[in-house]
Amino acid sequence: MTTAWVDASAGASGDMLLGALVGAGVPVAVLQAAVDAVAPEPVTLRVEHVRRGGLAATRCHVEVTDTARHRTWRDVRTLLAAADLADDVRGLALRVFERLATAEATVHGTSPDDVHFHEVGALDAIADVTGVVAGFVHLGATAVTVSPVAVGSGSVSTAHGLLPVPPPAVAELLRGVPSYAGAATMETCTPTGAALLTTLATAYGPQPAMSVDTIGVGAGGRDPEGHPNVLRLFVGVPADAGGGPLLLECNVDDLDPRVWPAVIAALLEAGASDAWLTPILMKKGRPAHTLSALVDAGRAAGVRAAIFRQTSTIGLREQPLTKHALEREIVAVDVDGQRIAVKLARHDGAVVNAQPEYDDVARAAADLDRPVADVLAEAVARGRAFLTPGDKI
């Protein structure tokens, strides 16, 4: 399981994130292929190794001649819908631009569909978004933690005139997200950067406990005095926190019930050892479910991320558990020529339980054209042979 931490203490922009991804080992070809799929005109990603504030960094130039710099949210949506992109890349890119459109509509008092993107509607910004989300999908990061975001100070020239930093759209995008001015007297977080960070983030804060494999350092376009204009991307695996199993839970009352099987499957895929639903009655008499997941502490970040991505919850509870598990062993029994696995459980060396694996029983029953109950009874009887005398099955 891959986890990532974004150090945005010097701000964030699309090209800084692209550079950090390349520096962290994502092939430029992966980013270029995603950009080519969506761009209606040629766009080239050119990588350059530079220094910012004395630090070595990767600068990713997005080179384009764009004949239509102003596009609506509908225009961008059409481009992405028609692009030959993987569904997860397309979905993330759409979420980034939807977030941008919603923020712009909020600050200008209009609707998202009426928003005319200016800087972020240009092909270079579309390339930034598509390339960055393709890069993170390539990394396979199931958890992305973002540091408090430095936004800068002063003023910035935009299509709407001279605006204070952070400009209104950035301030709206970062609503509820840890941010601060920082040392720079310039804009350090762009709308594209803010939208990308807030879409990709599964958590905010300092670097989580992790074993770091690669570090990418993405360079901004300017090299101001006083601070390195870079964004750092740490990629690795979660450190084993040594805290044993955790129970993660949340209450959900507004999710289509048809989605729950996919949610449970996603949590198990993310690393949960078990996941289940409990019907509950919430305040105001509203029927709901408690979603519970049991997970080792070292894999909890990915399961947290899956819960937030797969459900409508905006918070979850977490508590450490003490788990007592018997030693287990798998053996095989034969029922009319069909091999059925039986799980043995030992306590102090004695086999105290033996249970057939139901999937094997169901398969054998289908192959033998016999009732499942009959095959199960035979498998249980054969499993008894493994019990230590005097113990139960």
Swiss-Prot record:
The keyword Lyase applies. GO terms for biological process: protein maturation. InterPro entries: Ni_insertion (IPR002822). One of its GO terms (molecular function) is nickel cation binding. Gene3D superfamilies: mk0293 like domain, Transcriptional regulatory protein pf0864 domain like. It is an enzyme of class 4 (lyase). Signal peptide: none annotated. It catalyses: Ni(II)-pyridinium-3,5-bisthiocarboxylate mononucleotide = pyridinium-3,5-bisthiocarboxylate mononucleotide + Ni(2+). Pfam families: Ni_insertion. Keywords: Lyase, Nickel. Its EC number is 4.99.1.12. Involved in the biosynthesis of a nickel-pincer cofactor ((SCS)Ni(II) pincer complex). Binds Ni(2+), and functions in nickel delivery to pyridinium-3,5-bisthiocarboxylic acid mononucleotide (P2TMN), to form the mature cofactor. Is thus probably required for the activation of nickel-pincer cofactor-dependent enzymes. Belongs to the LarC family. This is Pyridinium-3,5-bisthiocarboxylic acid mononucleotide nickel insertion protein. It comes from Nocardioides sp. (strain ATCC BAA-499 / JS614).
